[in-house]
């Protein structure tokens, strides 16, 4: 059964920041289109096969199972709500961002 998805407020803000950066700093509408297409394809895959992406382990998030998917140079972090058949998109980060620092400051409940 296919899952639905929902973005947290943090994930929406992260996505806005990514798109703004791609559009204004790279001045490339092609980069924006490519990112959005990769995001769409990744979301389709996650909704069909939610457990297929890598489960991450980090000392700062041991209370929830979080998976990650790479989209260009960004990482999409999500959790699975199996009861409600929902994918929760938690955050996005740049692939070169320090994961420990990111998870230490990340509030996954918002």
Regions picked out by a protein language model, each given a short descriptive name:
Residues 34-35, 52-55, 109-110:
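Juxtamembrane/interface motifs at transmembrane-helix termini
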Residues 1, 65, 85-88:
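Residue-level signal for beta-strand positions within conserved beta-sheet cores that form or flank
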Residues 1-38:
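Arg/Lys-rich, positively charged N-terminal/basic patches that mediate binding to nucleic acids
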Residues 71-75, 79-110:
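Enriched for short, Lys/Arg-rich terminal
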Residues 24, 28, 48, 52-55:
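Charged, solvent-exposed alpha-helical segments that act as regulatory interaction surfaces
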Residues 18, 22, 43-46, 50:
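Hydrophobic recognition helices of helix-based DNA-binding modules
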Residues 14, 38, 42-45, 68:
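Residue-level recognition of specific faces of alpha-helices
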Residues 51-83:
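Basic/aromatic recognition patch in beta-strand/loop cores that engages polyanionic ligands
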